[in-house]
Amino acid sequence: QNNLEYYKDKRFITIGFENHPMIKNYDWIEISYKQADKSFSIASLNGVLAYDREYNKCLKKKKKINKEFKSLFTIKPETYSGKHPVDKSGKSNFENTEFYLNDGIVVTTCIDWSKKMEKKYFDHLKVFISTNEFWNWINSNPY
């Protein structure tokens, strides 16, 4: 278990679990909750798969996962790509697909970090399920 400190604002805490015997489909699981919440209600649950320099394989797996979500939800997702905001050089890329639900969001994303950023991060696919409150916080909270 690792306490992950991605963001400057500490309103939410994210804990990561790697190589846990209960984790079958992902390399890493992240659970986020509001720091002040004594009941530890989950605000976000994420599954992460490492894709070391295999961005096309990541996109292929993401497409397969999105197909499963499309069979569950009646809403049309939004897909977009761009430069990752953490990498100020503009050499890291991502592709997101977002399913907006009434009380939350489901996002699948592939991130292809630049060689420099790979010293700190790893290329990966993330399946992100969160409350609207957490999603709004994460998008307004600088790294």
For each of these PLM feature ranges, what is it?
Residues 18, 27-35, 81-86, 110-112:
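Short amphipathic beta-strand and strand-loop transition segments with alternating hydrophobic
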Residues 22-52:
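N-terminal low-complexity, intrinsically disordered segments
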Residues 1-31:
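N-terminal Sec/ER secretory leader and immediately downstream segment
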Residues 1-3, 7-11, 44-143:
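Non-cytosolic coordination micro-motifs
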